[in-house]
Amino acid sequence: MKNKITIGIVGGGVAGLVFANFLKDSSRFKIKIFEKKEFTNKPATGIQISNNARRILNKINFNQIDTGQFSEVHKVNIFQYENKNKIAELNINYFNNDKEEYVSLDRNLLITFLLSELKKKIEVYHEEVISIQNNTIHCSNKLDEKFDVIIVADGIFSRFANKAWENSLKKINALAYRGVIRGYDSGTTKNVDLFLGNNRHFVFYPINKSGDFSFTSIFASNSNSLSSDYSSASSSEELLGISSNANDEIKKIISSASNVYKWPIYHRPTINFGQDQVFIIGDASHAMPPFHAQGAAQAIEDSFCLAQMFEKNILNISHFKSIRTSRVEMISSKSYRNLFIYHLSNSFLKKVRNILIKIICKYPLISKFYFGKIYNYKFKN
């Protein structure tokens, strides 16, 4: 009997778990996941899964989740930050097909689903990985194990490419606050609300059908401090203090939050998919600004594409680069552009922006052309 290909996955987040799920039933692979933290429920955090990622997740039974636990997004309402005057609305139903709708949910639900779908077919070790050398994973408990292939999926603060890569993490001139509010009556659980202001914007969306919502408030910031953790505790009072020119709806949302967290926003200017037999995926490979809600979606795409390659016995990083680089670069570029567009403060430029947004959203052909490149994606190896 031919020996199985051994795969070590560093990181038990979205990217690593999706990849493992696609290969869990294959008799050709033996997989272990290394995740230093226990899988316990963290504070609720909103996550958006656009159509391109939903299509992939359905292949591992996401469409069997109780639909009450997430919310289908039908449109994006775009408002002025200061007065809630409506600029336009984007009809997401242009891209929604049955069971392939754009959805928003609590990230904990997604992780729990991915873990349950593994059905204990893949071993998960709660050990901290210290280093990767010569295809060997070295853990803090002195455990060393060699693999044929290693998948690095340990997120934005990844340390396992090389020193130059570790130091390539850059901070964007923006600071984000986020929180979740429970039992909020917004009148709908099917919309994303986006508010555009001077050097700031605010995003609000449901994470289930029970009245729970996630918000993110992003401000231009020149702070150069880098936190060793992704987020730190804040408060609704602190956020209200820097949101004095927000409309009443935004202030009401912030006031309703019991827990608020803030974090600087990072990115990696270059993409690194790995070398030799060490593949890098998701935020570890191409951390991008979160201004197109594509971080999780691109991690899911990476995982699916790589798993499809492995199923066809293509264990080649050059091939992976050839099918992923241009798409990731395109979406990352759009995300950077959105930050500039959302935060315009010049009155004339804002008027031009609003006119263009109205045109894009009003005409289906233009909407489908502009957003279809992202949401209609279907990978063919």
Write out the residue ranges for each language-model feature:
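Conserved Walker B
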Residues: 37, 156, 285
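Conserved N-terminal helical subregion
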Residues: 2-7, 24, 50-180, 224-237, ...
